[in-house]
């Protein structure tokens, strides 16, 4: 298994800290609004990583957090006259619903920052005791990055650009020093009583503390195997996480760092701050979650994905082929490539090489369909073909529906009944040799984007886009 390590900037063999076990931490959302397609892409990318590792024989523990203490949450809660707990719980539920619709496996653990305040305070106290952290006059506590000789080694950032983004605090020793603890500033602020005084943790300390309490190994030079997240988190968030872990515990946070690429809308990075977010819940109004998942996984996870609906509909053809084969093989079958599972898994073991994996998948679908055409009554290999389809489901998280359900997506129960009534009316017309009426019914349904197919078992129908 090979993965691309952001820190080394190259593909490297995956060699876990404990043989055949992988512990992964993925940065989750800050829950002040609904999740957008950028969040979906990150969740799907590392869901693919998890599935690939599991099918390669690894025992995987994947932790994905919720940041439920943050300035954006506080500001929106004040605006909506809610507590931060009320507001964050709304968006945690929304995010969970969205990811369920995208068939993303539930993490082993989903810690909330608010549940680990003691661990955060303890880590800050350690940094103060080591004289690596310092307090300024307003009570805020910062980490002195000059005490970490490896600061910047992960992101290799452009300091003139990135440090300007942090903002200037006059009492900071260095511009890149980052806040560990924000003291309580008054009635419109949120604070928790602690040995550090009333206040709340900074963003970066939250993830490091949750990793330490939920995943970290002892007696190893790294706390976890893989730390993952979106490319926008590389600096300052992941750089600062790595720094404070080295400073507090004397070990590296993660052996490997993995980052997924952006989702662009009109060639601009999609983000809430830019106001061009495409929320998952809105996309799900137009497209089934499996169709969205299939599209978002179709571009290599490190590449930028330029979202457009034309490409989404083109990618749906791949799903159609999977379900068309599944539909055929449930009744008949032919020969298949016996090495299919091995070949597609090897593609994913090469830094999740999805384009190569999808090429193997396309080849299998085409060759199997050709053999079904040549020998439609051969049932000897039915179990093996269905096993291959099941393997696709487990590896890529697609192809898990019944074919009838898939091809009738987007049609309500009452609409289905109307279509069935029309099919029955057409059947009677054909029996009465009124072929003009039968053709008119077919054309009428085609205008509603309903295609009819006559089979030996009767007429079946599909919704098309």
UniProtKB/Swiss-Prot annotation:
The UniProt record lists the keyword Signal: no
Motif segment ('KMSKS' region): 269-273
Database matches in Pfam families: DALR_2 (PF09190), tRNA-synt_1e (PF01406)
GO molecular function: ATP binding; cysteine-tRNA ligase activity; zinc ion binding
Keyword list, A-Z: Aminoacyl-tRNA synthetase, ATP-binding, Cytoplasm, Ligase, Metal-binding, Nucleotide-binding, Protein biosynthesis, Zinc
Subcellular location: Cytoplasm
Amino-acid positions noted as binding Zn(2+) in the UniProt annotation, renumbered to this chain: 27, 207, 237, 241
One biological process term in Gene Ontology: cysteinyl-tRNA aminoacylation
Motif 'HIGH' region per record, residues: 29-39
Residues engaged in binding ATP: 272
Cofactor(s) recorded in Swiss-Prot or TrEMBL: Zn(2+)
Cofactor note: Binds 1 zinc ion per subunit.
The enzyme's E.C. designation: 6.1.1.16
InterPro entries the UniProt entry points to: Cys-tRNA-ligase, Cys-tRNA-synt_Ia_DALR, Cys-tRNA/MSH_ligase, Rossmann-like_a/b/a_fold, tRNA-synt_1_cat_dom, tRNAsynth_Ia_anticodon-bd
Cellular-component GO terms for this entry: cytosol
PANTHER family registered for this protein in UniProt: CYSTEINE--TRNA LIGASE, CYTOPLASMIC, CYSTEINYL-TRNA SYNTHETASE
HAMAP family given in the database record: Cys_tRNA_synth
Family, similarity comment: Belongs to the class-I aminoacyl-tRNA synthetase family.
Quaternary context: Monomer.
Protein name as annotated: Cysteine--tRNA ligase
Classification lineage: Bacteria, Pseudomonadati, Campylobacterota, Epsilonproteobacteria, Campylobacterales
